[in-house]
Design a protein with these regions (language model features):
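Rhodanese-like catalytic fold shared by cysteine-dependent sulfurtransferases
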Residues: 4-6, 18-29, 35-40, 49-80, ...
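C-terminal motif of bacterial Sec signal peptides marking the signal peptidase cleavage site
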Residues: 13-17
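Structural scaffold elements adjacent to functional motifs in cytosolic proteins
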Residues: 42-44
Length: 120
């Protein structure tokens, strides 16, 4: 019985470890420039009013609310995207959705609230 319980515990541990794996890389705000140099496009998933108030130069806007409705229009399935929002919460959700659809994404763990570079 002890062996069976031990085996069950090991299986549960392995299953929980597998479930926590993300299908994308996460970088800090300082990693954006390197990813842009590697050919990634900046995808800002804030709402349009937030985006218009200030965004990273050359970023495109695709709100998380659109992605949650399976609206991926305008995104290139062969593209590489670095995903940013205001604080890192929405970008993680968007990265989850995009990676499930086989998009090549990198999540920014921080957001525009930590960005010190130029904005448009």
């Amino acid at each position: 019985m002890k062996k069976l319980m031990g085996l069950i515990a090991i299986v549960m541990l392995l299953l929980s470890a597998c479930g926590s794996q993300e299908g994308f890389e996460t970088v800090t705000i300082d990693g954006i420039q390197k990813k842009v140099e590697e050919g990634y496009s900046v995808l800002d998933v804030r709402e349009p009013s937030e985006f218009e108030a200030g965004h990273i130069r050359a970023a495109s806007n695709k709100p998380l609310s659109d992605l949650q409705q399976d609206n991926f229009e305008g995104l290139d399935t062969d593209g590489k995207y670095i995903v940013i929002c205001q604080s890192g919460n929405r970008s993680k959700q968007a990265s989850d959705l995009l990676s499930e659809e086989y998009y090549n994404v990198v999540n920014v763990s921080e957001g525009m609230s930590s960005w010190t570079g130029e904005i448009e």
